[in-house]
Amino acid sequence: DLIIESMAEDTQAKIDFYKKLAPVLPQKTVVVTNSSTLLPSTFAKYTGRPEKYLSLHFANSIWKNNMTEVMAQSQTDKRYFDELVDFANDIRMLALPVNKEKNGYLLNSMLVPWLLSGLDLYVSGVSDPKSIDLAWTRGTGAPKGPFRVFDTVGIQTAYNIVMQYQKVPSLVSPLLKKMM
């Protein structure tokens, strides 16, 4: 059995959920989080099965961007890590193993600084969101600029992710909070 939790990036809400879920699940159940930033070690003890708890983060628009990141924590049994990689491959995802716990995993570790750069350009008065997005899309051929990405993931999710990072530019986090 496999349970995939896909809640907002809210640490306390996830802890509360796992505390309620753990007593009603059969011990054989593997539990994974679809978190894109939070570390599985933060929640493992609340699941009642730390050896069967890890992360399986699906990229946005998985029907098109069929990629997932698989990350264990120190108590995860390697057998379940390997089984989760196989499961992801079986459902036609490109399973990318993350070998060490890292906030942001692979994708968001690269994406968040890029998003913050776009916000910084706007907050600093360098340009407007439309021009910033056009600079990125026309300059790189990418389908979306940073502000379109914010529209895709939602401002609340973006804010929660950004707040997980230690070096948030001082002007950016208040802007995101205001936009929510």
Which residues does each PLM region occupy?
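NAD(P)-dependent Rossmann-like dehydrogenase/reductase catalytic/cofactor-binding core
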Residues: 75, 79-82, 89-102, 113, ...
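N-terminal alpha-helical segment
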Residues: 14, 63-64, 114-115
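Rossmann-fold dinucleotide-binding core
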Residues: 30-100, 108
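A ubiquitous short alpha-helical element
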Residues: 3, 100-105
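Rossmann-like NAD(P)-binding element
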Residues: 1-30
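Short alpha-helical
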Residues: 12, 38, 105
